[in-house]
């Protein structure tokens, strides 16, 4: 069955065709470049932090090389290329794959005659459009990966350049101006039928629930730029002055010095995929994992010129501190749980083991039964006197893909998923967080949010889009059978249910009470998962191998009362 459809086969969304001469500025010359050769080429390397020179030496370009890649036939191998998925199918694809591609192409948004992205949902049955007719940066990532894997990189190129253009806009919420490097949460194409001109309207958080700026958008943009570069072998886009400046602006926001004593990023609730009040304020695992991955991607993409060299050095320093902090204080397994259970409190000195003064009585009862003897995960949040022990899927999957998790920790996360399959996978992969909060805690944490009731939406709902992240993590850890089992579950329901945004219930059995149908990232997430499972070399565009220069986590002795 032929999956690849040329650009001429793309279907336009009638209200999203676009044209605007004045919005392009000097980026128009980049957009109008001839199509690159899609044939996969040798790409650049995951550079070790030990290669970073602090002596002032360097060179003007990024470095070439190979990435270590998982091979089903035997351990690690080098990624030479990622051919279009449709070219090397070893077996007949599932019947719903064709429907998925058709639905994905229906969601395409066009600007100036060129495909620019995909809208969040193409649900004609819904009376309220809300913001589901916009192109969200985080939502487009699985769509972009699907097109890259299918040999259609121009869509991704246009998206990267247009969002870069939007980054340069003045950004205000009420009378307050946002940082120059902030990327939009989403944008919309507005068509003026009388003038025949289309314009872009970006949202930097001023229209979002709670008016929170998206911290993750800039990280996803850098990660996607690397994926594009890995997939095509084309370094010219990343090395343009515009892309180099865009990365530096994003990094300036998150590498700036302040009052923090931690290398993690302090964030407000609702700043990421969980975009409503869910108690993730502070130092959420999702943001820290994306931050880590974006730093490692930027380390590969930044030039070692006068402007880039300073950032390369700052990134290397931050990565060392961040990896140690996350692996030491966010990691939880059976032994660490037992240690925390026996912690002393009120320790004043540099020798304190309970550095955050976590009260053992604050450990929730559910955790003792949930934690298996074999397995572990990165908890949701760590800050003074507070540990959020909930499981968050996206942060843990990104931790594996970015190698924030050590190989042993990555294996333990997979062990946990297998041991707690009913809780984390159920009947529809994958729980966005576990467990759900309810009753009085729900009222306090969510502010009585009617959308985030227990086992619904972000409060323990099941999100099919996470399937691509699970599959990538499974392939990287050599456990593709877990992904195959999860995909089999999803294929039983997704098309029949109309590609819902999320599922409700403890097992993920019911279509979400407010879930949009034909949710684009549910569709794209499934396609990416299928293509990666059929051709694991695709993993190279979204996975980073472990950097040996990062020191392993130091074993800490437990603190307890005799």
Curated annotation (Swiss-Prot):
It comes from the Eukaryota. InterPro entries: 6-hairpin_glycosidase_sf (IPR008928), 6hp_glycosidase-like_sf (IPR012341), Glyco_hydro_100 (IPR024746). Keywords: Carbohydrate metabolism, Cytoplasm, Glycosidase, Hydrolase. One of its GO terms (cellular component) is cytosol. It is found in: Cytoplasm, Cytosol. The keyword Iron does not apply. The keyword Magnesium does not apply. Its main location: cytoplasm. Belongs to the glycosyl hydrolase 100 family. This is Cytosolic invertase 1. The gene is CINV1.
